[in-house]
Amino acid sequence: MEELQRYLKMDRSRERDFLYPLLFQEYIYALAHDFGLTKSIPYESMQILSYDNKYSSLIVKRLIIRMYQQKHLIILDNDSKNKNFLGHNKNLYSQMISEGFAVIVEIPFALRLVSSYQGKEIEKSINLGSIHSTFPFLEDKFVHLNHVLNILIPYPIHFELIVQNLRCWIQDASFLHLLRFFLYEYHNWNSFTTQKMKQNSLFLKENRRFFLFLYNFHVYESESIFLFLRKKSYHLRSTSSIAFLDRTHFFGKIEHLKVVFRNDFHTMLWLFKDPFMHYFRYQGKSIMSSKGTPLLMKKWKYYLVNLWECHFYFWSQPNRIHINQLSNIFLNFLGYLSSVRPNPSVVRNQMLENAFIIDISINKLNTLVPIIPLIGSLAKAKFCNLSGQPISKPAWTDSLDSDIIDRFGRICRNVSHYYSGSSKKKTLYRIKYILRLSCARTLARKHKSSVRSFLKRLGSEFLEEFLIEEEQVLSFILPKISSSSQRLSKERIWYFDIIRINDLMDL
């Protein structure tokens, strides 16, 4: 990291013009490798995340030598024809270069972010990076709104548009040419920006960080004008969050847009005045909610479609944006089924000798666990069948008993940790039951005995260790309600340390 800082200090005024030489620096690939290790999931192996023990400085040096010999443009072609290189998978070179790309391409944005906060007091916003931080916002805002726009974020007609947008931020022509070559090589860019991306292991495992950066940059471009319009029409102060990559240097983008679009949009801002408009994005979708009328939502819908198609050349269709009444739908996002439903209550009011009973209905946000998709994920991972019946895990029978229990325990704790905000815990208990019995059947299969006899011989306490830990943590956090396990099971808990959805929860 010190070498990278010294390189950038050589010419701070032109750091954007000298990104290409960084591809020949070994420490860049070491940084990418370290990033992959720190972002791994506790119960997923490094091989699943494609940051395994096969990484070595020798492979990096061989790669750099081949690039010095002007062969970097044919590395991917040759590498795709060879099944392995020194015992590695056939996509090793392309994976390593894309990881280096991901580190280098973030440098200009990181430098602007640091410079924008020089001399300013930066507030700690680490909690904003948590996925669960979205739900308290929904609990506070959504219950007062009427309509919602479900938007499937459009993607560029051609990936050349992404390169053209990056030219405004990166001036290195050689680096951009090589970037263009990468995008031509991975021509199925569209599959990454849709929900089918989950089936494409190339993007998810081998080039995760590189394409995630490009996707965030693409979304940032599509959102920039919308946020600018909202600020101009509502006269509200916008704040940037350093926890999200696409929010980087938002103020600088606004200053640029003020000059370009001041005259064009001044006459139409009055069409969209709505002080109760809220917007948030998750995965490949976004949601706009409002307290306004359906007519106002239709204006936003067709305005966004025309803006994306005419200005950004994004492929979009009106049927990709759905207008719904908030009280009549379930929002399926971030692994939860969320809905706003009236919560009736009876209030007894007594004035002198007269008593009145008043029925009050207050909207409440309900967050449910989607049982069918989650059981489908468990069935895909071979923990149960499609009907939800627990089955053994034959692939794990070669491990020690303690390792098997530990792996099941970590999965169970991760699921409980993520779905601790559910309004109804019965579905979560069913998932725990599936994992508990699957663990017992795996151990019984290993020892060639039945589940009943195995549990009778060893007792059921050996399985309770990883199933009770979550309740112990909640009792420590909320000591006032720890005495009542029934009340504890009804409490919704949102954690601020969840920064990603793992494969089991990516619904």
Curated annotation (Swiss-Prot):
Q: Which InterPro entries does the record cross-reference, listed alphabetically?
A: Domain_X (IPR024937), Maturase_MatK (IPR002866), Maturase_MatK_N (IPR024942)
Alphabetically sorted, this entry's keywords are: Chloroplast, mRNA processing, Plastid, RNA-binding, tRNA processing
Source superkingdom: Eukaryota
- GO MF annotation list: RNA binding
List where in the cell it is found.
Plastid, Chloroplast
Disulphide bridges, residue numbers: none
An example GO BP is: tRNA processing
Where is the major localization of this protein? plastid
Keyword presence, ATP-binding: no
Q: Which GO terms describe its cellular component?
A: chloroplast
Q: Name one Pfam family in it.
A: Intron_maturas2
Describe the family membership recorded for this protein in Swiss-Prot or TrEMBL. Belongs to the intron maturase 2 family. MatK subfamily.
**What HAMAP family has UniProt attached to this entry?**
MatK
Function summary: Usually encoded in the trnK tRNA gene intron. Probably assists in splicing its own and other chloroplast group II introns.
What name goes with this protein?
Maturase K
**Can you name the source organism?**
Ranunculus repens
